[in-house]
Structures are given as C-alpha cells and as structure tokens.
C-alpha cells in the first residue's frame, strides 16, 4: 500500500508538470505579461466595404492569446492578420477569425506566436463598440487535460502492477476506466450540451430535482434550456462563460408550481435528479451543480454495468467492450435517459444469459433481479419491452416441475401485458378524447394524430407501410 500511495503522489505531480509545462511549453518558457492597447489611441482606417481596420505594432514578444474587450448588444465578428516571427526569425503572416458573444463582453483568440504586428478588422457598425485589445502570455489550467494525463498514468500503473487482481476482477478495470473517461468527457464539454436533445433532458431532470411542488428557473437554467449559452473557442472563454452562468444563476426569471409525483417514464432521470438536487442543497455554484448531475448519472450507469460484468458468468469481455464504446461512455456522461436504459438492459440481459446457460435449476434471486432491471429500464423506452419475452425461451429442465414452468411463463406474459398497457392505454385514451400528444422533445409529431390516421384509414396506412418497406429493402437503396 505504501508503494501505491507513493506512486499516486508521484503521478499527481507528474500530471501537473505535463499539463502546466509540457503541454504549454511556449507559454511557460517565455515572459509572463499582460499589455493593453486602447482602441481609441490606435491608428485606424475605413475601407469601401464598410469595414474598419486597426493597426497594432508589437515588440516581437511571445503572445499566447489576444483578448478583445467590448460593449455591445449583438455579437461582434472580426478578422485578424497576425505578422509573427517563425522559428528561423523570418516574418510570416496568419489570418484568424473570431465571433465574440455580446453576453460576455470579451473574447479570447489563441495565437501562440511571437507577434510583430496585428491588423484587426471589424464592421464599421461595431468599431465604436470595441474598448481595448490585450496581448497576454500566461498558462491556463485545464482540469480535463490534467485528469486525462493523470488517469492514463495512474491506470497504466495499476493495471501493470496489479495485473493479477484485475485479471480476476475485470469489473473493477471497467469501472475505473469508465469513470475516468466519463469525467474527462464531462469536463471537456465545459458548459455546452452536446448530446442528442440534451437541453430537453436537462430541463426534465432539473424540474424533477425540486422535491416539493414549487420550483424556480434562473437565467442560467433558461439559457441552457433555450440553448442561449455562448460557445467558447478557448479555455479562457470557457472560464468566462462559467463565471457568467454562475452570476446569471442569481437572477430568478420564472417560478411555478409542479406536481410532486415522478411519472414512471421519467424515473430514468433519477441519478441526474439526485445530483442536481444535492448540488443545489449544498449551495454549490451553478456550473458545479450541472457537473454533479452528469457525474451522478455516470456513477450510477457505471455501477450497474459493473454489476453486470461481476455477476455474469459468460461474455464478461463483451460486456466490457459494450460498456466502453465511445457512444456508451458519452451517453453515461450526459443528461439523457438512454444511459439509464442501456445500463439496466445490459444488467438484465447479462443475468438472463447467465441463467439460461447455467446447468443448475433456475435461481429465484438472479431471475428476479434480471426481470426487475429490464422492467425499470423499459420505463422510458417502451420499445424494449419485448426483451422480457426472452424468458419464454427458458428450457423446461430449468424448472423443478411443469407447474412451476407454466406459472413462471404465465407471469412473464402478464407482466408483458401490463408493461404494454402502461403506454398503450394512455395513448388510446388520448385518441378517444381528441387530446393532442406529441414528442416531449419538441417538433410537430403527434402520437394521437398518427394513431387516429392508422385506425381511420387502415388500408391506406398499410399501403404506405409496405411501400416504405419495399423502398428500404430495395437493393439499390442498401449501402
């Protein structure tokens, strides 16, 4: 244990060295400074294309980034022509483009060169909105890069020095890799929602994270839900966006009443709900609370898949590969119900395969856990309900008697009917009442109208369906 402790300490400081020194070597080895030029004191020229160009003369020092400081009610687009010295001391020119969000009031452009001069071009209407431009050289700490380096070094050390243990317990290998990769993904995403319909899933999880029947929406929450959060191109901009979100979270723009009951279709958000609720209860910043919501989802889904690998007697490597697929880890690290569904179905199917292939009689505990995992996993994705029918394939020699077999399969049939009824009956009720129910993720789809059309024009619908299937199965359309 002492050796492992010393190794962890060494790897920690080595990771800091790599992130702060090696990955930012040019910034580290050159002088640290910050020099400001007021735009009003700089020579400018207007051209016939309706643009204004500012000329900035510099002294050839290394510049890591250039900051634009402005006050505007609209985004500002700019072009930069940077004259710099290459490794041979010769002058070269590179052109950069930037779009600055009016919400931040400043923008950062990565340069990474020894700058001789700069030509900054903006539209005439934006010229009077620029206040100053700042040439800087400094290192910027990145949690994502640090954690990536730390995880690679630490996991490599552990897997090599404790290969016997991880060879016998592959589930722990999976758990450590999944949590490490998922956390890096969460930190790399910064403040953007990159998964499919993630802003809608976040809205549902945030709403349900309020325990009582009262909830508040801050400006930061509404900005995420309405996709109004600025996007950053540099680490500095991402830090500024985080500060802006934390400040915007102090402004409440909407408060309303909500139901206390969590619908069964939304129970897949429980890990995210717990993370968001805990962060708000502890008084964490908005950015940290959102991170906690994603992180709890990652922990829960990783724990479920870890259990699937642990208790499965067959296909452990296959489960590990599926659990570490890029899309799987990405979903585990996002606001979505798909991660919850995938993890529980993996557990349910893994236990079913173990039960099916084992030579012993059916194990009640293992079977019940498998069925429960499938049922809960299908709450938000009814399309996976037929997976329960797999238990009809259970061989007769798995049961102690014919009566036990019949009761078991009858119970599975009843469970299937109940699961199908849980979403079919409400849909039929909406059709008979004329209520319009669509996809809660948005769009113009209407489940009610679609089902009404099918029931009202069965022959026409059958023709459309067959034509669509024929087109899909046509050899010319298959890639």
Predicted regions and their residues:
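Interfacial juxtamembrane loops and adjacent helix segments
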Residues: 210-291
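Start-transfer (signal-anchor) and selected internal transmembrane alpha helices
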Residues: 1-24, 140-185, 407-415
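Short acidic/glycine- and proline-prone juxtamembrane loop motifs at membrane-interface regions
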Residues: 334-341
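Transmembrane-helix signature of polytopic, membrane-embedded enzymes
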Residues: 284-287, 306-327
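Transmembrane-helix motifs of polytopic, lipid-linked glycan transferases
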Residues: 161, 291-314
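Perimembrane helix-loop-helix junctions
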Residues: 352-361, 385-419
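Membrane-lumen/periplasm interface segments of multi-pass, membrane-embedded glycan/lipid transferases
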Residues: 250, 426-479
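Membrane-interface alpha helices of multi-pass inner-membrane proteins
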Residues: 330, 366-382, 387-393
